Amino acid sequence: MKQNLRNWCICLSAMLAWTLNAVAGIEVSQTLPTSGTPEHRYTMMNAQGYYCNATTSPTKDAGKYAQFAFYSSKTADTYYVYNVTAKKWLAYDQKKSYTPQTGFVKLVTNKSQAAESRITEINGGSYEIQPYTSNGVGAIYLNWYKGVGVDNPENGTVTLGLWTDNGS
Protein backbone atom coordinates (compact mmCIF):
# COMPACT_ATOMS: atom_id res chain seq x y z
CA MET A 1 0.00 0.00 0.00
CA LYS A 2 1.35 3.33 -1.04
CA GLN A 3 1.73 5.71 1.87
CA ASN A 4 0.90 9.35 1.59
CA LEU A 5 4.01 11.10 2.89
CA ARG A 6 3.95 14.84 3.04
CA ASN A 7 6.95 16.74 4.21
CA TRP A 8 5.66 20.09 5.30
CA CYS A 9 7.70 22.13 7.65
CA ILE A 10 7.00 23.51 11.05
CA CYS A 11 8.94 26.71 10.89
CA LEU A 12 10.29 28.93 13.58
CA SER A 13 9.43 32.48 12.54
CA ALA A 14 11.84 35.37 12.68
CA MET A 15 10.49 36.04 16.18
CA LEU A 16 11.21 32.40 17.08
CA ALA A 17 7.57 31.26 17.30
CA TRP A 18 6.90 27.81 15.87
CA THR A 19 4.86 27.80 12.69
CA LEU A 20 3.55 25.13 10.42
CA ASN A 21 4.11 25.84 6.74
CA ALA A 22 1.23 24.03 5.09
CA VAL A 23 -0.41 25.12 1.86
CA ALA A 24 -3.82 23.58 2.52
CA GLY A 25 -3.79 23.58 6.31
CA ILE A 26 -2.99 20.88 8.77
CA GLU A 27 -3.93 17.42 7.62
CA VAL A 28 -4.62 15.27 10.63
CA SER A 29 -3.88 11.58 10.71
CA GLN A 30 -6.61 9.10 11.58
CA THR A 31 -4.50 5.99 12.07
CA LEU A 32 -3.15 5.90 15.61
CA PRO A 33 0.46 4.70 15.98
CA THR A 34 -0.77 1.62 17.85
CA SER A 35 -2.75 0.63 14.73
CA GLY A 36 -0.30 1.53 11.95
CA THR A 37 1.54 4.44 10.37
CA PRO A 38 0.11 7.98 10.49
CA GLU A 39 -1.15 9.07 7.06
CA HIS A 40 0.23 12.61 7.17
CA ARG A 41 3.73 13.34 8.41
CA TYR A 42 5.57 16.63 8.73
CA THR A 43 9.07 17.83 9.59
CA MET A 44 9.78 20.73 11.94
CA MET A 45 12.18 23.45 10.83
CA ASN A 46 13.10 26.94 12.04
CA ALA A 47 13.80 30.01 9.92
CA GLN A 48 17.56 29.33 10.03
CA GLY A 49 17.17 25.89 8.45
CA TYR A 50 17.46 23.77 11.59
CA TYR A 51 15.08 20.82 11.82
CA CYS A 52 13.85 18.99 14.90
CA ASN A 53 15.55 15.66 15.47
CA ALA A 54 13.92 12.76 17.32
CA THR A 55 14.35 14.53 20.68
CA THR A 56 13.06 17.86 19.20
CA SER A 57 16.60 19.29 19.38
CA PRO A 58 17.97 21.19 16.36
CA THR A 59 19.78 19.44 13.51
CA LYS A 60 20.89 20.22 9.95
CA ASP A 61 21.68 16.56 9.24
CA ALA A 62 18.97 15.37 6.82
CA GLY A 63 19.35 11.83 8.13
CA LYS A 64 18.25 13.03 11.57
CA TYR A 65 15.13 15.01 10.61
CA ALA A 66 12.26 13.71 12.72
CA GLN A 67 8.75 13.27 11.35
CA PHE A 68 5.63 14.36 13.23
CA ALA A 69 1.92 13.66 12.85
CA PHE A 70 -1.02 15.70 14.11
CA TYR A 71 -4.18 14.27 15.63
CA SER A 72 -7.28 16.34 16.27
CA SER A 73 -8.77 16.75 19.70
CA LYS A 74 -12.28 17.72 20.78
CA THR A 75 -11.36 21.42 20.88
CA ALA A 76 -11.17 23.52 17.70
CA ASP A 77 -7.63 24.38 16.52
CA THR A 78 -6.21 21.99 19.11
CA TYR A 79 -4.07 18.96 18.30
CA TYR A 80 -2.02 16.17 19.77
CA VAL A 81 1.46 15.94 18.22
CA TYR A 82 3.06 12.53 17.69
CA ASN A 83 6.80 12.19 17.05
CA VAL A 84 6.78 9.40 14.44
CA THR A 85 10.57 9.02 14.53
CA ALA A 86 10.85 8.65 18.31
CA LYS A 87 7.50 6.83 18.57
CA LYS A 88 6.50 9.24 21.33
CA TRP A 89 3.79 11.83 21.95
CA LEU A 90 4.64 15.43 22.81
CA ALA A 91 3.65 16.45 26.33
CA TYR A 92 4.39 19.16 28.86
CA ASP A 93 3.64 19.93 32.48
CA GLN A 94 0.53 22.07 32.42
CA LYS A 95 0.74 25.13 34.70
CA LYS A 96 -1.22 28.30 35.39
CA SER A 97 1.36 30.29 33.40
CA TYR A 98 4.67 29.74 31.63
CA THR A 99 7.97 31.57 31.35
CA PRO A 100 10.54 31.41 28.53
CA GLN A 101 12.65 28.28 28.96
CA THR A 102 14.54 25.46 27.30
CA GLY A 103 13.55 21.81 27.61
CA PHE A 104 9.80 22.43 28.00
CA VAL A 105 8.54 19.57 25.83
CA LYS A 106 8.46 16.00 27.15
CA LEU A 107 8.24 12.86 25.04
CA VAL A 108 5.80 10.26 26.41
CA THR A 109 4.77 6.77 25.34
CA ASN A 110 0.98 6.88 25.57
CA LYS A 111 -1.51 9.28 23.99
CA SER A 112 -3.30 9.45 27.34
CA GLN A 113 -0.17 11.19 28.70
CA ALA A 114 0.14 13.56 25.72
CA ALA A 115 -0.76 17.24 25.91
CA GLU A 116 -2.96 19.19 23.55
CA SER A 117 -1.53 22.26 21.87
CA ARG A 118 -3.29 25.15 20.22
CA ILE A 119 -2.21 25.60 16.61
CA THR A 120 -3.17 28.91 15.04
CA GLU A 121 -2.67 30.13 11.48
CA ILE A 122 -0.77 33.40 11.56
CA ASN A 123 -0.06 34.27 7.90
CA GLY A 124 0.53 32.75 4.48
CA GLY A 125 -0.21 29.20 5.57
CA SER A 126 2.08 29.43 8.60
CA TYR A 127 0.99 28.30 12.03
CA GLU A 128 2.20 28.81 15.61
CA ILE A 129 2.02 26.20 18.36
CA GLN A 130 1.06 27.11 21.92
CA PRO A 131 0.78 24.89 24.99
CA TYR A 132 -2.38 25.32 27.05
CA THR A 133 -2.26 26.59 30.61
CA SER A 134 -4.18 24.84 33.38
CA ASN A 135 -6.84 27.55 32.83
CA GLY A 136 -7.32 26.36 29.23
CA VAL A 137 -5.63 29.34 27.58
CA GLY A 138 -3.09 29.05 24.76
CA ALA A 139 0.07 30.49 26.28
CA ILE A 140 3.48 31.44 24.90
CA TYR A 141 5.03 29.65 21.92
CA LEU A 142 7.21 26.59 21.25
CA ASN A 143 10.74 27.34 20.05
CA TRP A 144 14.43 26.81 20.79
CA TYR A 145 14.67 29.45 23.51
CA LYS A 146 18.03 31.28 23.35
CA GLY A 147 18.61 29.87 19.85
CA VAL A 148 20.79 27.02 18.64
CA GLY A 149 24.03 26.80 20.58
CA VAL A 150 25.05 26.16 24.18
CA ASP A 151 21.47 26.00 25.49
CA ASN A 152 20.14 24.01 22.50
CA PRO A 153 23.09 22.13 20.98
CA GLU A 154 22.84 20.84 17.44
CA ASN A 155 22.08 17.10 17.41
CA GLY A 156 21.56 17.25 21.16
CA THR A 157 18.85 16.07 23.50
CA VAL A 158 17.41 19.34 24.87
CA THR A 159 13.74 19.43 23.90
CA LEU A 160 11.82 22.40 22.52
CA GLY A 161 11.36 25.33 24.85
CA LEU A 162 9.11 28.40 25.08
CA TRP A 163 9.31 32.04 24.03
CA THR A 164 6.91 34.96 24.44
CA ASP A 165 6.74 36.42 20.91
CA ASN A 166 4.33 35.07 18.33
CA GLY A 167 5.11 34.56 14.67
CA SER A 168 3.68 37.81 13.32
Go through each PLM region and give its residues.
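Sec-dependent, cleavable N-terminal signal peptides
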Residues: 1-26
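Lectin-like carbohydrate-binding module/patch detector with strong preference for beta-trefoil
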Residues: 24-168
